Design a protein with these regions (language model features):
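Active-site cores that bind ATP or allylic diphosphates and position pyrophosphate for catalysis
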Residues: 1-131, 137-140, 162
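A conserved active-site cap/scaffold subdomain adjacent to cofactor or substrate pockets
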Residues: 133, 137-173
Length: 173
């Protein structure tokens, strides 16, 4: 079984009275996003276009932890809305949370920013590039003699290429 761990839903359908009783009894709790079941969540990524997720594959993920602190993902959505963020650029590893984000925006009645998920830049051993493991800043590569145009060209072609398979682009392109 290669499925990711998923919330079992044991408290998903508690009545208001049952919830109030558990709180009155001092039981710890979290607040989760209740994902609609048996439907598709359609999102648009600026790089990939339309992506469809089956809601049954999504987890009712935690929004507020048992200590009352919002999760990073929840706080991030609220912050992006309050800051009027129009575009979100992030790595592929966040693609699985994209439908949950879309559902949160919809739940709040907020306009969702445009999202683009880019492939990760990997290190020599195939792992995610990390500042803990060496060069990650543009200045590091410039110090090693890489031209600014080469760095821009490399980044411009991450996860995309022109229809003619051109590998070298001018700065104007």
């Amino acid at each position: 079984n290669k499925e990711a761990p998923k919330y079992d839903g044991r408290c998903r359908n508690l009545s208001e009275e049952e919830v109030e009783q558990k709180i009155k009894n001092g039981e710890s709790y979290v607040i989760r996003q209740k994902i609609p079941q048996s439907c598709c969540v359609e999102v648009h990524d600026e790089l990939r276009g339309k992506i469809v997720f089956k809601s049954n594959d999504l987890d009712d993920h935690v929004l507020i932890k048992s200590n009352g602190i919002p999760t990073y993902q929840f706080a991030n959505i609220v912050d992006d809305h309050l800051m009027e963020i129009s575009h979100v650029t992030r790595g592929d590893e966040w693609l699985s949370s994209f439908p949950k984000n879309a559902l949160l925006y919809k739940s709040f009645g907020w306009q969702m920013p445009k999202y683009v998920h880019l492939p990760l830049i990997l290190n020599k051993s195939g792992g995610k590039l990390s500042k803990r493991q060496g060069d990650v800043f543009v200045e590091d590569y410039r110090a090693k003699g890489y031209l600014p145009e080469a760095i821009v060209n490399f980044c411009a072609l991450l996860g995309w290429h022109p229809k003619n398979d051109q590998e070298i682009l001018s700065m104007d392109e």
